Amino acid sequence: MKIEKIKLPIYHGTLIVIKTKKMSKVAAKYDLKNCDDCDAITFVRSNKKGIKKYFVAFENAKPSIIAHETVHVVNYIYQHHCIELDRFNDEPQAYLTGFIFDEIYKSLNKKNGNKQQ
């Protein structure tokens, strides 16, 4: 299991990207239920000061799965900051989605020995 921590600007907190060969190891480490058959999972923990850690764990890191988990991360961030999604002014959401996707993608590819931008 490989883990990378990425600081989140503006919204604070940390994005934690996990690449694993067996999701059951992630489930055991973080006491997660019902994720042994998952290709990926997103979950949140808070430290003692209430700062959020957004975890994204991947057994299968296809772009469509990264995109799927990115939606969960963005929604968690919006929920924790009491921000309502706005279909008519979605630029902040679009920028955050792009940022989260790029950070996950770079992290997962770096762990595979590739340096992709």
Residue ranges and their predicted role:
Residues 85-117:
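Post-HExxH zinc-binding segment in Zn-dependent metallohydrolases
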Residues 31, 59, 80-82, 109, ...:
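Short, flexible coil/linker elements and helix-boundary hinge sites characteristic
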Residues 64:
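Membrane-embedded glycan transfer/ligation machinery
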Residues 7, 26, 39, 50-51, ...:
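A general marker of short, structured functional hotspots
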Residues 1-28, 111-117:
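N-terminal soluble segments of membrane proteins
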Residues 70-87:
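Catalytic Zn2+-binding segment of zinc metalloproteases
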Residues 13-61, 73-77:
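Active-site scaffold of zinc-dependent metalloenzymes
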